[in-house]
Structures are given as structure tokens and as C-alpha cells.
Amino acid sequence: MKIKNLLITSLLVIISCVKIVLAEEKAISEHQYNFYTGNFDFSDDKQKAVLFGFQHQNENLVRDTFLGIASPVTGAFITENSAAYIYTGVEWNYSLGDKLNLTPSFTPGIYHEGNGKDLGHAIEFKTELQANYSISEGTNLGLSYNHLSNASLGVKNP
């Protein structure tokens, strides 16, 4: 049983470190769809959970700004404990060569606790830093880290 749990935990750690992004070519579609998986609150042994998410980006709304190439994003994730987060916000894309990109983002949203972690308020702000590598035209492999905070809107702000 311990070996099975160790294997499952190892697999989840590996999956949580990898974010696969599937995007259609611009000539085919103006929309980019990202599917991802990972760990929610990986540092809390009692509350950590596997999560699955989806994100949409409209290529027609991309703007070149003094902060980088800005793009609106909308998405959601759900955890194995039925906690869910729906968000919309902006991300900035910085190219670090032909194949490597760095993408910070800020996305306010609504959080539902479900049977998961109590974050203290329904309104949460997600900040994220993502690095991805272009494997081929329209396919990227990336790694990201994000943080949810209610900015002390609630009594509790873990």
C-alpha cells in the first residue's frame, strides 16, 4: 500500500510540475485554449489536492504595451475536493528567444470552497508566473507557479 501511495504521489508531483498547453495555429483560429493539471496547495499535507483547469485567450485582443505583449485570459479550475475557481484577467508574454517564453499574469476571480480549503473569501486574486517551451508549431510545454489571495478582504487570508 505504501509503494502504491508513493507511486501515485510521485506521479502527481511530476504532473503538477508540467503544464501542457495546446494551442491552435493563428491561421486556423484566433483562439488559444490551454489545458492544465497540477497540485492545489502542494505545501499543506492536509489540504493539497490535484486540480484540472482550462484557459482561453483571444488572439485578436493581444496588445503590445510598454509592459510586454498583454493578452486577456479567462479560465477555471476544479480540484479533486470540488473546490473551484473561475477567473478573468491579463497576462504578459515575454519572448526569451525563439522557443522560450515567460508569462506572468494577474487574474481576479470567484472561489468556491467545495470540500477543499477555506480561503477566507469568495473573491480571490491569482498571480502566476509561467515558463514555457515551444515544442512545435502550436504546441508548448510549460511549468507554472501561482498564488491565490483575497488581499485581506476576509477575516482569513491563508
Residue ranges and their predicted role:
Residues 40-50, 76-87, 96-98, 116-122, ...:
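Solvent-exposed loop/turn segments connecting transmembrane beta-strands
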Residues 56-60, 92-94, 133, 145-147:
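Residue-level signature of outer-membrane beta-barrel architecture
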